[in-house]
UniProtKB/Swiss-Prot annotation:
Gene this protein is translated from: atpF2
Protein family (similarity comment): Belongs to the ATPase B chain family.
Function of the protein: F(1)F(0) ATP synthase produces ATP from ADP in the presence of a proton or sodium gradient. F-type ATPases consist of two structural domains, F(1) containing the extramembraneous catalytic core and F(0) containing the membrane proton channel, linked together by a central stalk and a peripheral stalk. During catalysis, ATP synthesis in the catalytic domain of F(1) is coupled via a rotary mechanism of the central stalk subunits to proton translocation. Component of the F(0) channel, it forms part of the peripheral stalk, linking F(1) to F(0).
Topology of this chain in the membrane: Single-pass membrane protein
Pfam families the UniProt entry points to: ATP-synt_B (PF00430)
One cellular component term from this protein's GO annotations in UniProt: proton-transporting ATP synthase complex
Keyword Ion transport attached: yes
GO molecular function, one term: proton-transporting ATPase activity, rotational mechanism
NCBIfam families assigned to the protein according to its UniProt record, in alphabetical order: ATP_synt_b, PRK05759.1-2
Descriptive protein name: ATP synthase subunit b 2
Membrane-traversing stretches: 7-29
Amino acid sequence: MNLNLTLLGQAISFAIFVWFCMKYVWPPVIAALEERSKKIADGLEAANRASRDLELAQEQASQILRESKENAAEIIEQANKRANQMVDEAKEQVIADGKRLREAAQAEIEQDVMRAKEALRAQVSVLAFAGAEKILGATIDEKAHSEIVEQLAKEL
């Protein structure tokens, strides 16, 4: 047995095996590895993209929530302003009604005073007539005349 020939045969067999593997086995293995690597890279990219999308969605959600809170606060503020305005309008209406009622009552009081004055004038004229009749009917005495006038003044 010749060691050199065996070694040469094994080397040739190995070279054929390597050539066969490089020609037929290696390309599908490399293609599978590249495909797997591409899938992994695509998966990582999709995960990164999803992470960015999630962050964007969270930012948008927080912004929408902030805007909603601001809108709610604005609506509440407007409602409070409107309520205060309505209260002020009601107060003004009550004050105006009070003034109107007070003026009406004052006018009625003035009318009552005028009626009372007219009634008193009528009574004074009646009393003056009665006093004049008593003065003219009685003697023209200075003392009696002053007593009648004092009595009339007391009656008024």
